[in-house]
Amino acid sequence: MALVKGTNSYVTVAEADSYFAERLHSETWSGASPTDKEKALITATSLLDQKPWVGEAEDELQPLAFPRIGYYYDPKYGRDLDLIDTPERVVKATYELALHLLSNDVMAASSTVKSLSVGPISLQQISTSKEPSKLDELISPLLENSGSLSW
């Protein structure tokens, strides 16, 4: 299926090309074929749409998670913003995740183990991540309960 903004992607290839033209370390994007760029944007949108976003879909039949009814607090602006349009954070997350998908084998997750011991009490956290950490920063204000990401 071809990329259709608002149906299976939050952005067009042309918008992504413009975004990455101004960014360092985006050679993977500029070197990808138009078909692979479309696939990456469609897949990124699909993955992002699986998140527990705040608010509710504006129309129960809409193909994507946005637009939504509701508000979220954006620390960048220091105030609540409405969800009637796709937030800038989701658009940027779509670009960044698409680049990540082109650059990495997302099936091979990286694991991080963190542990803390105080006397007889020991805590251990194992984090498996397939997404760039930048995504958490971008979209966490829009997630229900502002939880951390997991794919």
What spans do the regions from the language model cover?
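Divalent metal-cofactor coordination and adjacent catalytic microenvironments
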Residues: 1-151
